[in-house]
C-alpha cells in the first residue's frame, strides 16, 4: 500500500511542479505586459490602455495567489513522498522514521529505563510519527503516564482511524510544515496571559476619520490649490505619523518573538481544518481564528519597514487597525489558542498509534477484565522482527506469581520486557503482539537494569534498594504488576538469597502480580511454602555436540541446565 501511495504522491508532485513553473512564467509575462501597457497608457494618456494596465496588475496579483496555492500543494505532495519512503524503509530495512524521544527521558521512572520506552530503538522510536515538538512531548507523556481509565475509548479511536491511511498521511504532511520549538510555546503562553491595554474609543474613531480627512484635503487642496486644505493635510500628516510612531513600539512589543511565525500558524490552521472535517463531533471551530491570527501577524510583520509603513499609516493607519484587530483577537481567543494547538499534537499521537495498528494487522486488541488477571497467548516482543520473534503463553494472577529461572542468555530479560511492553501497549489502547490477550491493566513496576552513580556517590546496591523501596511504597497504594530481574546483585550470595526470599514474601503480602527472575534455585523452593501463590517457570538451554542452543520457549518448573562453565571453557577462560 505504501508503494502505491508513494507512486501517487510522486505523480502529484510532478504535476504541481509543472503547474508551479507554468504560473511563474505566466506571472513574468503578465508583468512585462503590464509594464508595456502602462507605459503606453501614460505616453498616450489613454483611459483604455490604463484600464488594460490595471487589469494586468489585478491578474498579476491573482497569479501570485494561485502560485502560493500550488506551492502549498507541491510541498504537501513532497511531504507525502517522504512519509511513504520512510514507512517503506522502516518495514523493509528496519530504519526508524522519526525522532527517538531521548530528550524526554526522566531521571526516575517506574519502568521507562528498564523497558526501553525512550531513546534509540525504543518503543517511542518505534511508534513515533509525530513532527511537532508538542506532538513528540505528548507522545512521551502518554508512554510515561498512560491513562488507564480510558483504554476502551482509546481502542475505538485507534480502530476508527487505522484504515484512514489517506487522511492520516494528508494530516501528517501538513504537520510536517510546522517548524515549532519549546520556546515558541513558551512565548505564546506568555503572550496569551499578558494583558494588552486596548486602544481607547477616541483613538479608534480618530484612526478612521483622520486618514479620510487627510486624503481628501490633500487631493482637493493640491488639485485646486486651496492653501487651507493644504495646511490641514500637512497638519494631519504630522499628527498621523506622530500617532503611528507612538504606537510602533507597542506594536513591536505585542508581536515580539512572533516574526515570521504566521506560516507556521497557517500550517496549524490546515491541520485543525482537517481535524474539524474528520471529527465534527469535537466541535473544535478553531481553524478560522488561527487563520485570523496568522494573517494579523503577517500583516504586522513589516511594521518596522519604514518605506512601507510610513505611507501605509499616513494614508490609512493600516498597522494600527491591524494592531487593534489583534487586541480584539487576543481578548477573545488567547485562553484557547494553546489548547487548540495541543489538539493538533494529540491527533499526531493518535495518527502514530493508528499507523502502528495499520502496520501490524496481525496484532490483537486485548479484552479487559476486573479480576486482576493477565493472560497472553503467543505473546512476543513487538519490536523484534516477526521472523526472529519467539512467542510464549503466560498467565499471571493471585495464584500465579511466577519465579522465573534460566541460564545466561536463555531469554529471561527479553521475556520480562515482552510482558512489560505489551502491558504498556494495553494501557495505551493499542493492539498487542499476541494471538490472544485478556488483561487487567495494572500499573507497571519494573527493576531490571540499574547503574552506579559516581556523581551522586551512590552504589549499584544502594540504587537497587531505593528502587525496591519505591516499588513497595507503590504497592501499598494500589495493586500493580511487578517485574524484577535478578535483584540484590550487589551483595553476597547468602545475603542475596535471604533478601530475595523476604522481598518475594513481601510482594505476596501486598497482593502483587508479576514475575521475579532469579538464578538461585533455593529461592525457587519457596513455591513449596506458597503452593497456592507461587509457580516456577523456566527457560532452558541445551548443549549438543559441543554447541550451545536456545529455543527461548517458556517451560514449567525450575531450570536444570547451566551454561556459564561451558561458555568459559569455550572461550579458554578456564580449563
Segments (PLM) and residue ranges:
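Alpha-helical coupling/stalk and coiled-coil linker elements that connect catalytic or binding modules
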Residues: 1-407, 414-444, 466-467
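ATPase nucleotide-binding head domains, primarily ABC-like/P-loop NTPase cores
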Residues: 353, 360-575
